[in-house]
Amino acid sequence: MHQTKQQRESLYKVGQRIRIIHMEGEDTRYDGKEGVIEHIDGIGQLHGTWGSLAVIPEADKFIVIG
């Protein structure tokens, strides 16, 4: 199921802390990283303090931890 940016913004908020379990199509360097959501872009990808790659909610595995 694809979510709209508005639906994602109701689920995920700037300032929330997440832990990445696995980013689809990437190696394991981001697995286990934690960070704070700093921005949700126009297509709903999450950007934050965990590194330079955006988290894609439909593809990547992560949990909100705070």
Enumerate the predicted regions with their spans.
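Basic/aromatic-rich interaction segments and small domains that mediate binding to polyanionic partners
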Residues: 2-5, 13-66
